[in-house]
Amino acid sequence: MKKVFCLFVALVVSLSVMAAECVIVPRPVSFEPQKGKVTLNSKSVVYVTDKSLVRPATLFCSYVAAEKGLQLSVVENQPKGKGVISLSIDKSLATEEYLLDVTKKGVVLKGGSEQGVFYGLQSLRQVVFHSEGNAKKVSVACMTVKDKPHFGYRGGMLDVGRYFFSVDEVKKFIDILALHKINRFHWHLTEDQGWRIEIKKYPNLTKVGSVRKATQVGRYSKRTQPVYDGKPYGGFFTQDEVRDIVRYATERYIDVIPEIDMPGHMVAALASYPELGCTKGPYEVRKMWGISQDILCAGREQTFEFIEGVLSEIIALFPSKYIHIGGDEAPKHRWKECPDCQKRIQEEGLKDEHELQSYFMKRVEKFLAQHGRSIIGWDEILEGGVSKTATVMAWRGPNRGIMAAKLGNKVIMTPTRFCYLDYCQTSDRDANKEPMAMSLKAKLPIRKVYSLDPYDQLNEEERKAIIGVQGNLWTEYIPNFKHAQHMLLPRLAAIAEVGWSYDNKDFDDFTRRMHMLRKLYDKCGYNYAPYFFNGIE
């Protein structure tokens, strides 16, 4: 019996050692530890077999220098000796797929594209950081990693409409996405509380629409009056700054998807150009959170001229295939009372105001399609009918995504109870001294995020409609970037693992690897939330 017990203990220890060698987040498809180690030092180089790989190689070297102190150089001529990191493109692999082979002689990394190589380097970055050594020498354990993502769309959304974040802060957000192999940055640029992007044809959007007179303090209910801080608040991105951010993201293989929310969430635009509203104002940039009854008028041609003018400049700034046009939380009260909207309903043979919104969205989609772009919209675009070519972002629950999938639309799953990273992170916000969050009732610990199943209740054919997942960071109660990081991390890692490792998830193993990744968060100076790491849910 004693002999059996000893064998059991030996097996457990052996397995734990093997598992401990995998430190990569998100979890790779296949990880096999090998015998031995390879030494990297200041003489080691990153050899690129294709000029297109200089960029990801250079980024990798900057990561290793900042996080480990080890200075590596990039070369295009084949070097001799050991400790070489060799990068190449293998067209037989999928675009985002990579193979990483660490041997005693060196490191060989192949990707299906530049992007695949970049993801392999993000994995190697984590491996090197956790390896023994210092700025002079690092010993990396030998291993073989075969990896590719399950979902092609893996997104992170940042709302800069409620609170503004600087160019450097947005770039840091992008860096966080890149570390987790997130490949879409959904940039929520316009809101009732502020218009955040320069549109040259409509200068009042930033002259007037980017600044609110004051901001709501704390919460309020229907039984109490809102309290304001009395301080003007504003900010916007110039077009040159937008180009800089898009370039920065592109260098990290992240597609920036701009969102111009319409027809609702447009009070800042209405304050800038009152003639675009059903009542023609006066309007002011909204000081309080919540949903406004005032939305763009769907009955006047002037509204569509405005939208096309704005989107023409957006198209020029963002090379993304997708443009997000919102479509959420658009009350129909003003449309019901607006003679122009009612006339439009009659002339177009529409059934009601929901079909009027469908007309509105389809018309905008047609304009974007003429410029080679596709739309994403929040799941409200399903109401009143939606074109088959629209991609639906399901936020009000997985059932909305299921509905869209059954209709044949492409779907991005981002349901509130799994993916809204502005929610509280523990069961007792006060006891755990959590900062302000969107909902005091809704709790979203990292375990809950990790449990998301984007395919739930879908058959094999319907599953093909689900193109990915996304974590959303709304900022009504997040006034600065330090707070934003606290809400984002470590829960974004769970979103990333759902998107990348859907077929290979294991929460216990995720927890172990996250305790390793936490050290890299510390080194990068990220202000992550501590609850999960302290065993608090």
Predicted regions and their residues:
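Bacterial Sec-dependent N-terminal signal peptides
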Residues: 1-23
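Contiguous, structured surface segment used for ligand recognition
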Residues: 20-153, 483, 495, 499-528, ...
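Flexible loop/turn segments at secondary-structure boundaries
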Residues: 54-55, 164-166, 192-198, 263-269, ...
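Residue-level detector of anion-binding/catalytic polar loops
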Residues: 71, 183-184, 255, 374, ...
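Feature activates predominantly on carbohydrate-active enzymes
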Residues: 93-294, 298-304, 309-322, 363, ...
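Active-site neighborhood of glycoside hydrolase catalytic domains
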Residues: 269-275, 279, 284-390, 395-408
